[in-house]
């Protein structure tokens, strides 16, 4: 009798162990619209046989790793002149260390993995500057006075610290304007690059990338011009039509090759509403061979433009490189940013970057341009000690950047649009699966995740965002 009992217990233990193995675990991280629960780790889910616990009346999200799409570079924002200054100069060492870890550390933070860095001043800068400023009316075609010393004060130290915390960060650089003396009216504000300055500007960009890399910041991508269809009025910017951009790339591409730079060139870097711009550049055989793909912004048009360009040029990549949050946005701000991430990724983006990673209580410092933008981190300098607040953008991006690693691959997942559950899924190189789900409805939604013939049951509260991870 005792022997039979022992055999029964042993068999029961084996069955329990087998059951546990069959019930694959899913980690769950959730953020509510009011941020009362932010990247909160919920109870784990378990996959089990579909017939065992599947209700026919719930939505099913199918995840299929056999259907594979683009490789992922990362998720992040920009350490602008203003952002870097706030982080480096306006926080105590203890506070700065905490913020940097919460931004970039894969264990303690959200592991920001993509940085788009202005080359020279943008609108989110404390002053207007380039790396080759000259007195009005003077030129320096040999770039004798070239220097990135301005950036060594606080921008480069912050980028280097970010790279130490997360070496997987992809860095992109973008000029808002050439030095004023290279332009049609000798100013960084508005105007165009002169054709007779192509050689000098090419050398300037080569020197900029080389200087950054010598300073310890590898540059993976460079876009030729920020928002080339917008002629700025009160901050650095440059009008550059597609006809001029493709002509300039014919200079820049060979110069990068001659200098031994493996930095990839991106075209356009502006809104969805003019896909014909990158299509013109990519249709030029001389320019296109030097261009890795197209950078997009979100401030006009529709995300479907990314798919349009991909359909015409499937061999070229796509990047969402700027989409700021700001006071103009209303309602569920968490959902606004989550929709950007999900929809950009479902339309072939290899990255999603917002704008200034840190701003103050006045949405600056700035010298023109956006004075209503929102950062991942808002630093209130009107109180002592300065108060740090993490915004909806921080948490929305964190739902991707913390779990989707560099070189992950987007895989297929069911999606139900802005009236239901929006989803996007990835497989990391270690084999782990990441599913991001946004509940666009104002009510809790029961659903099931189906993976390799098994089902995990889940519920997501109205307006909330969740990330599900399993292996």
Regions from the PLM with identified roles:
Residues 8-17:
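Bacterial N-terminal signal peptides
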Residues 21-23:
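Boundary at the C-terminal end of the N-terminal hydrophobic targeting segment
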Residues 37-219, 250:
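N-terminal catalytic cores of secreted or lumenal carbohydrate-active enzymes
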Residues 77, 111, 171, 222, ...:
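Conserved, mostly hydrophobic/aromatic
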Residues 199-221, 228-328:
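Active-site neighborhood of glycoside hydrolase catalytic domains
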Residues 317-396, 412-415:
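Aromatic/acidic polysaccharide-binding cleft in carbohydrate-active enzymes
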Residues 402, 413-452, 463:
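Carbohydrate-binding surface patches
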Residues 461-471:
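C-terminal beta-strand-rich structural cap/linker in extracellular carbohydrate-active enzymes
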